[in-house]
């Protein structure tokens, strides 16, 4: 009899249901709500003693509520004698605060979150496309960071784009974009943003010939969509025939939907690590792919003590 059990909070129950469907097991029974003063309440409604528990809970908006749900659930499972607790965090919030720039008086919030997850008794963490790989080093427990690129690459291949070119929207994303370009066997372009003079707007230098090409911008997340929309504009101005964007995490905060609708971006393709808002679902230029099969396979391998890296060879 399998000891694996999968539970979820309120962050992304649809993804959790898709994952257990892939694993051919039922979704675990846990009640997660709030007390009248807004504090998180949780109760496990079935026996988990000796079980291999997986909690699927991205820490997306509302970030603090979803993070506290994860922490409180983990404590409940630990106190209920689960043999192992794995936090499956498809989107890891607070990941962008991972350093102190020039000794500024700021928190390293990614480290704070790592400490919180460890101290409540979580044994292992599974993430998808961490914003910065070094965050794995903030944990004193094993962290498996899997990639959304296979899902994105499969869809790009299915679209049968002509004269294709993968483009990194900034220098920081070159490694990710190069890996996608290599998988597809196509050219790589890079957008180098730089401010020539103080108080002047950024200038986008295009590295690579995009004239007449179908350009695909690749990034780990799309937040306000400002960078992608400006990049799409620069590519079109340099002669690109079409510009698409493929991003794993659809954060889509602030005026993101408005920015996308008013841009020259032909389409934004994302995964379901984060659920789309009603406005995002209604936007004809946004399409969502299912990452559940990849997450489910990683969960299965962890539970069976199999290699995770073998998934991406």
From Swiss-Prot:
Binds 2 Mg(2+) ions per subunit. Pfam families: Pribosyl_synth (PF14572), Pribosyltran_N (PF13793). InterPro entries: PRib_PP_synth_CS, Pribosyltran_N, PRibTrfase_dom, PRTase-like, Rib-P_diPkinase, Rib-P_diPkinase_bac. Its cofactor is Mg(2+). Keywords: ATP-binding, Cytoplasm, Kinase, Magnesium, Metal-binding, Nucleotide biosynthesis, Nucleotide-binding, Transferase. It catalyses: D-ribose 5-phosphate + ATP = 5-phospho-alpha-D-ribose 1-diphosphate + AMP + H(+). The active site is at 193. Belongs to the ribose-phosphate pyrophosphokinase family. Class I subfamily. Involved in the biosynthesis of the central metabolite phospho-alpha-D-ribosyl-1-pyrophosphate (PRPP) via the transfer of pyrophosphoryl group from ATP to 1-hydroxyl of ribose-5-phosphate (Rib-5-P). D-ribose 5-phosphate binds at residues 195, 219, 223-227. Mg(2+) 1 binds at residue 131. SUPFAM superfamilies: PRTase-like (SSF53271). It comes from the Bacteria. GO terms for biological process: 5-phosphoribose 1-diphosphate biosynthetic process; purine nucleotide biosynthetic process; ribonucleoside monophosphate biosynthetic process. Its main location: cytoplasm. It is found in: Cytoplasm. This is Ribose-phosphate pyrophosphokinase. One of its GO terms (molecular function) is ribose phosphate diphosphokinase activity.
